[in-house]
């Protein structure tokens, strides 16, 4: 077979596999979304089986009330080994659900565990024992007009985006997540670990430098004056899905957000306060 035809065949096979992957993940999302039931049900864990996956879904409130009974209910990856999966199913008295890939027996699955996790995590609740988070708060936010408030939030978001891009240009791993507080943002690195925490601090420093430069160029009331607090601690994570789609926002709540919310009251405009950074 000519090399050109071989290349064309490989491209077609690759496109077909990509289409199969997207269709399968869309079906999985649809099933987990139906289980989710507007947020009353949380997906807890899954494990691979020959023709698909087994997974657990229980009332979200049960996840919180049972979190101390087995660490893997909220800690670690949602893909579980057979023994752990069985133990948690028995502990939560959960029915084991089955999702079939609906593929011929000789056809390998076009999805990876990471693909499945990317969908599964939209409907899961997890806890992180220690992660760096910073809180950007716009000083005197309530004193500005709605137009000025919108401009300031937009400028703050722009600085965070620029900072993340600049840090990434140096080959540093940063996947910045944020959730709004109304007059600012909590921000953290989705990547976990001490290096990731250092990287998110670097993002913060670049963002603050960018904001300082903006103050020299743009009308004062359009550029926010920032109070910032930074620290490390534990938190729960969840994804807030929209009613009609899986699009939504990441949220964190727990020890670290409570501590930062208290600490911000002591921060002055243009000041950074740093909470305890000890590793627990």
Task: State the predicted function of each range.
Residues 89, 97-106, 152-157, 195-202, ...:
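A generic short-segment signal for beta-strand/edge and adjacent turn/coil regions
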Residues 90-98, 145-150, 189-191, 233:
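A broad, low-specificity signal for short, low-complexity segments enriched in glycine/proline
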Residues 95, 120, 125, 174, ...:
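Generic detector of bulky aromatic hydrophobic side chains
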Residues 3-73, 192-280:
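Catalytic beta-strand-to-alpha-helix segment of the class III nucleotidyl cyclase homology domain
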Residues 120-203:
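Catalytic NTP-binding/metal-coordinating core of nucleotidyl cyclase/transferase enzymes
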Residues 109-124, 132, 136, 161, ...:
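Alpha-helical context
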Residues 1-6, 10-11, 26-30, 51, ...:
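Regulatory cytosolic signal-relay segments
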Residues 101-118, 148-164, 208-216:
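Short charge-dense sequence patches
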């Amino acid at each position: 077979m000519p090399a050109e035809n071989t290349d064309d065949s490989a491209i077609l096979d690759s496109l077909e596999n990509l289409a199969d992957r997207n269709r399968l993940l869309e079906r999985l999302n649809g099933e987990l979304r139906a289980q989710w039931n507007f947020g009353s049900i949380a997906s807890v864990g899954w494990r691979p089986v020959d023709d698909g996956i087994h997974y657990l879904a229980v009332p979200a409130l049960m996840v919180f009330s049972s979190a101390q009974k087995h660490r893997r209910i909220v800690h670690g990856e949602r893909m579980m080994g057979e023994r752990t999966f069985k133990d948690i199913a028995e502990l939560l008295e959960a029915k084991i659900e089955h999702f079939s890939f609906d593929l011929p027996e000789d056809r390998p699955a076009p999805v990876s565990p990471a693909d499945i996790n990317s969908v599964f995590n939209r409907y899961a609740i997890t806890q992180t024992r220690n992660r760096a988070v910073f809180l950007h708060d716009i000083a005197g936010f309530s004193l500005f007009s709605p137009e000025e408030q919108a401009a300031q939030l937009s400028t703050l978001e722009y600085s965070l985006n620029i900072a993340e891009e600049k840090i990434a240009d140096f080959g540093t791993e940063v996947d910045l997540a944020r959730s709004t507080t109304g007059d600012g943002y909590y921000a953290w690195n989705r990547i976990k670990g001490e290096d990731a925490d250092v990287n998110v601090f670097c993002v913060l420093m670049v963002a603050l430098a960018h904001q300082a430069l903006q103050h020299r160029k743009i009308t004062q009331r359009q550029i926010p004056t920032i109070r910032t607090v930074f620290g490390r601690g534990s938190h729960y994570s969840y994804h807030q899905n929209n009613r009609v789609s899986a699009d939504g926002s990441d949220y964190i709540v727990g020890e670290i957000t409570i501590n930062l919310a208290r600490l911000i009251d002591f921060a002055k405009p243009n000041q950074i306060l740093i909470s305890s950074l000890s590793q627990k």
